């Protein structure tokens, strides 16, 4: 049943698109495919080789909304784990009828110990070549994957507290961190998640995020922002994530506090400034710079 499948997200086996389907993804994917941020080969893991594309078969496709699906792919062996760590992403690839490769990075939010299969929540974007291709896959068809690419290697209690600022499908690496921290009883890191979307219906993984926040009330805070909503029914924030809100919610800059940012270009511009490339964080600008944060205090996925 659909409810059963969604409930499994609470022990998150899920993957969702990395930072949205933007034109920037094309350049990023090409750079990722030749980068050195890969995990060395290990047995019992499906994704271990930076030079090997692995075809996985789609076993289940479940409609969640008009433009979002839950897809389940089988790993190479039923006893395999994915080989992913927090925080890392995979590349996906398909070949167009004209013979062109379409490659996009996707961020996993799956439990690193999950065996046998890997799940995605895919949001279809207008004009998005990869999201449209994946969205239209039929059960029994395959998709090519490669990786994992390590973005930030999380260690328990790296910081006393962190802030996760995201928008849209940029929630994926942030959720990955949130889940990893709260799944480890020895990790006491406090987490403040600030997540923006167009409407309440666009919020990915909301039930799973809310469940984590409810279970870890002394460790996790969550703030939702939407552009528009029925004010009589919506209990979150309406409007943009502002500098004034961040000034009120964030801790003062320091070595024990880290801010992680992931989202569409507009969010980066307003909050932190964009990355130059997958390996170049670029200069810190935007609201965080205005609030006194320095480059070393912020990580952009």
Swiss-Prot record:
Family matches, as InterPro entries: CBR-like, Cbr1-like_FAD-bd_dom, FAD-bd_FR_type, Flavoprot_Pyr_Nucl_cyt_Rdtase, FNR_nucleotide-bd, OxRdtase_FAD/NAD-bd, Riboflavin_synthase-like_b-brl
Cofactor: FAD
GO CC, one annotated term: mitochondrial outer membrane
Chain ranges of the FAD-binding FR-type domain: 51-155
One GO MF term attached to the UniProt entry: cytochrome-b5 reductase activity, acting on NAD(P)H
Principal subcellular localisation of the protein: mitochondrion
Sequence positions that bind FAD: 158-193
Keywords: FAD, Flavoprotein, Membrane, Mitochondrion, Mitochondrion outer membrane, NAD, Oxidoreductase, Transmembrane, Transmembrane helix
Disulfide bonds: none
SUPFAM superfamilies: Ferredoxin reductase-like, C-terminal NADP-linked domain (SSF52343), Riboflavin synthase domain-like (SSF63380)
Stretches that traverse the bilayer: 14-30
CDD domains reported for this sequence: cyt_b5_reduct_like
Protein's name in the database: NADH-cytochrome b5 reductase 2
Catalytic activity: 2 Fe(III)-[cytochrome b5] + NADH = 2 Fe(II)-[cytochrome b5] + NAD(+) + H(+)
UniProt source species: Candida albicans (strain SC5314 / ATCC MYA-2876) (Yeast)
Membrane-protein topology: Single-pass membrane protein
UniProt subcellular location: Mitochondrion outer membrane
Any Pfam family hit: NAD_binding_1
Gene3D superfamilies noted in UniProt: Nucleotide-binding domain of ferredoxin-NADP reductase (FNR) module, Translation factors
Described purpose of this protein according to its UniProt entry: May mediate the reduction of outer membrane cytochrome b5.
Protein family membership: Belongs to the flavoprotein pyridine nucleotide cytochrome reductase family.
GO biological process: ergosterol biosynthetic process
EC number(s) reported in the record: 1.6.2.2
């Amino acid at each position: 049943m659909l409810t059963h499948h969604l409930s499994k997200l609470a022990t998150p086996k899920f993957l969702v698109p990395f930072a949205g389907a933007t034109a920037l993804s094309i350049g990023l994917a090409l750079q990722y495919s030749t980068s050195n941020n890969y995990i060395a080969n290990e047995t019992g893991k499906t994704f271990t080789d930076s030079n090997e594309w692995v075809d996985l078969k789609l076993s289940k496709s479940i409609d969640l909304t008009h433009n979002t699906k839950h897809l389940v792919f089988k790993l190479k062996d039923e006893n395999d784990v994915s080989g992913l760590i927090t925080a890392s992403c995979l590349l996906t690839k398909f070949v167009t009828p004209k013979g062109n490769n379409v490659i996009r990075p996707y961020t996993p939010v799956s439990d690193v110990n999950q065996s046998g299969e890997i799940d995605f929540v895919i949001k279809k974007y207008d004009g998005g070549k990869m999201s449209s291709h994946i969205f239209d896959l039929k059960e029994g068809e395959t998709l090519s994957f490669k990786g994992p690419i390590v973005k930030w290697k999380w260690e328990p209690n790296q910081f006393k507290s962190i802030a996760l600022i995201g928008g849209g499908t940029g929630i994926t690496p942030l959720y990955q961190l949130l889940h990893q921290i709260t799944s480890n009883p020895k990790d006491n890191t406090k987490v403040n998640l600030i997540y923006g979307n167009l409407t309440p219906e666009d919020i990915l993984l909301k039930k799973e995020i809310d469940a984590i926040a409810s279970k870890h009330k002394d460790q996790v805070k969550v703030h939702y922002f939407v552009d528009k909503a029925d004010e009589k029914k919506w209990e979150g924030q309406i409007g943009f994530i502002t500098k004034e809100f961040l000034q009120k919610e964030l801790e003062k800059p320091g070595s024990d506090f880290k801010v992680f940012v992931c989202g569409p270009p507009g969010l980066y511009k307003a909050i932190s400034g964009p990355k130059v490339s997958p390996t170049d964080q670029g200069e810190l600008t935007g609201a965080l710079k205005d609030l006194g944060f320095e480059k070393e205090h912020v990580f952009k996925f």
